């Protein structure tokens, strides 16, 4: 019994491809609603990791033996897959990193250090994850620059007019989250980028939450930098990418020094390798990066549009079902969202909700979601967050609702 | 909660009580109930210096010494943590500082609440135990200066 309107979308068949979903937790079937933290991995991704280590493990780019050639080819195949996935014009613009956090730190440490001066302004929004606050704070402190924060509405939406007022010729960089990890709200990044460019600023987009749900076309967005993590899109942890416009990347100094990123080294002077290798010092995370391709291929084989239809349906079903619970308030209840629902319940601490749901086999995230300033702004100490993926079902949402009723009863 | 009882005796009593529960619901409902019954911490002590901050919940604790015994009062914004804190107070309050410092605090394992001491919980419970022992050490040094 297919549950969504997407033709051919059989969520039950899909679930079978994720070995972990067969697991039981404390005598209950596992209900995994912490996908915004990390998603589960399909068998093809797990198999790709095992296959790499069992058949062609080798260091890449340097060896001339067969294993090295195979590993290099697979690694570079991921780069091409990522290029297409995010709509970059060339593979030189795709830098592999450990993930979104490292991508942002790469930009703050290289482009930032070379381009930000005392008195310059960097704009972020209230919705940012700590990963898109702290690197800029560190840079601003080092350079004597100023960090400006775009306010949000009571519901959590980016206030565009306030952003426009913050823009000036002092603005050198705007770094904003595409979709909020804590609330799921999608920012109007295209409009933000256009306005920022008019003011002469460079724009970085934190795509950690958006890349798995939304169609990403960095050329259409016209962003200067875009970052995402593999593990949030059904791929392995410890890998991800930074997209940067070629001209910017070429002008930027390297990040880490070491092997791979060099052309020639003498004790007097080192010349750096070409893009993208200039930013990939040392032996990279080969296995996980190779397996990331399998995750992206997996998403593409189902179709982002189909996944989105399914997830949107889960999101509205969950939002409506949860809002019907007495004393429960959904935070960030707006129209343009990825499949994340964040809520508070009167008189019950999120940690208690999380512990009591865990005992029923339901994994949600509780706390501040690495967005302490946002939580302060919403005037809550934290929320409970359920975030949905391609394999979640309405029945699981029913279990969550039932679970919350039980929490309320136990806490009463 | 007689002063005469040792930490080991009180811990054994708690383990005994918990052995009666055959479902997780009963166990947690008992802990929640303990949390609700914890005498409130005087507002004068509910200040930043007395905060033991976990990632998700906060515990406030104050200690005092009377007749060579250390006494604790505490509060938390999360109820399950508050219940566990109440058990810690039951075990430690009214004991000589020396006994608190040396107590292994095994009962949390024995009642199946080990996960609350785990790093991921960041509930502040682990930090709470550490702070209770540090306070006991401070009182011990104050009472009998070397």
Q: Predicted segments — roles?
A:
Chain B
Residues 15-16, 89:
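Amphipathic alpha-helical segments within well-ordered protein domains
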Residues 94-111:
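Glycine-rich phosphate/pyrophosphate-binding loops
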Residues 81-86:
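Short Cys/His-based metal-binding microdomains
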Residues 15, 72, 76, 116:
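Conserved short-loop catalytic and cofactor-binding motifs
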Residues 62-78, 89-92:
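Conserved interaction-surface patches within small, structured recognition/assembly domains
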Residues 2-5, 75-77:
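A short, ordered amphipathic alpha-helix with a cationic face
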Residues 4-14, 20-58, 65-66, 106-143:
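N-terminal intrinsically disordered, cationic/polar leader segments
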Residues 53-54, 76-80:
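Secondary-structure capping and boundary motifs in well-ordered enzyme cores
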């Amino acid at each position: 019994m297919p549950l969504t309107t997407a033709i051919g979308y059989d969520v039950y068949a899909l679930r079978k491809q994720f070995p972990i979903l067969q697991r039981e937790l404390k005598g209950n079937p596992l209900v995994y609603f912490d996908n915004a933290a990390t998603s589960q991995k399909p068998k093809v991704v797990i198999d790709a990791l095992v296959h790499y280590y069992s058949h062609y493990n080798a260091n890449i780019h340097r060896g001339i033996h067969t294993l090295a050639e195979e590993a290099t080819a697979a690694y570079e195949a991921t780069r091409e897959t990522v290029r297409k996935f995010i709509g970059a014009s060339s593979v030189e613009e795709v830098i592999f990193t450990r993930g979104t956090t490292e991508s942002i730190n790469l930009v703050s440490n290289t482009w930032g250090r070379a381009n930000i001066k005392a008195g310059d302004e960097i704009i972020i929004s209230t919705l940012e994850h700590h990963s898109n606050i702290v690197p800029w704070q560190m840079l601003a402190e080092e350079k004597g620059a100023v960090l400006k924060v775009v306010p949000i509405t009571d519901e959590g939406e980016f206030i565009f007019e306030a952003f426009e007022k913050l823009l000036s010729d002092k603005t050198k960089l705007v770094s904003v989250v595409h979709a909020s990890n804590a609330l799921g709200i999608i920012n109007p990044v295209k409009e933000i980028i256009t306005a920022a460019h008019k003011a002469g600023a460079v724009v970085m987009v934190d795509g950690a939450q958006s890349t798995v749900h939304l169609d990403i076309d960095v050329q259409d967005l016209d962003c200067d930098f875009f970052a995402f993590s593999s593990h949030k899109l059904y791929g392995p942890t410890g890998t991800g990418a930074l997209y940067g416009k070629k001209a910017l990347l070429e002008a930027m100094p390297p990040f880490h020094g070491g092997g791979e990123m060099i052309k020639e080294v003498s004790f007097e002077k080192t010349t750096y390798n070409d893009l993208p290798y200039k930013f990939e010092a040392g032996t990279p995370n080969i296995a996980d990066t190779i397996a990331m391709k399998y995750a992206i291929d997996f998403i593409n084989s189902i179709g982002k549009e189909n996944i989105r239809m399914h997830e949107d349906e889960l999101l509205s079903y969950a939002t409506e079902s949860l809002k019907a619970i007495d004393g429960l308030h959904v935070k960030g209840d707006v129209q343009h969202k990825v499949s994340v629902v964040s809520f508070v319940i009167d008189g019950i601490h999120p940690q208690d909700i999380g512990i009591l749901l865990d005992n029923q086999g339901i994994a949600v995230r509780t706390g501040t979601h690495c967005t302490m300033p946002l939580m302060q702004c919403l005037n809550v100490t934290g929320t409970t967050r359920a975030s949905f993926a391609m394999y979640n079902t309405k029945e699981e949402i029913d279990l969550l609702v039932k679970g919350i009723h039980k929490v309320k009863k136990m806490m009463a | 909660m007689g002063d005469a009882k040792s930490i080991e005796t009180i811990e054994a009593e708690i383990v005994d009580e918990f052995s009666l529960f055959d479902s997780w619901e009963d166990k947690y409902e008992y802990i929640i109930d303990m949390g609700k019954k914890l005498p409130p911490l005087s507002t004068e002590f509910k200040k930043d210096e007395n905060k033991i901050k976990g990632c998700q919940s906060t515990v406030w604790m104050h200690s005092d010494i009377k007749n060579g015994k250390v006494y604790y009062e505490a509060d938390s914004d999360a109820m399950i943590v508050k219940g566990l804190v109440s058990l810690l107070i039951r075990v430690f309050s009214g004991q000589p500082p020396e006994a608190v410092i040396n107590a292994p605090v095994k009962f949390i394992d024995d009642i199946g609440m080990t996960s609350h001491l785990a790093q991921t919980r960041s509930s502040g419970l682990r930090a709470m135990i550490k702070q209770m022992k540090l306070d006991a050490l401070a009182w011990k040094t104050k009472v009998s200066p070397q």
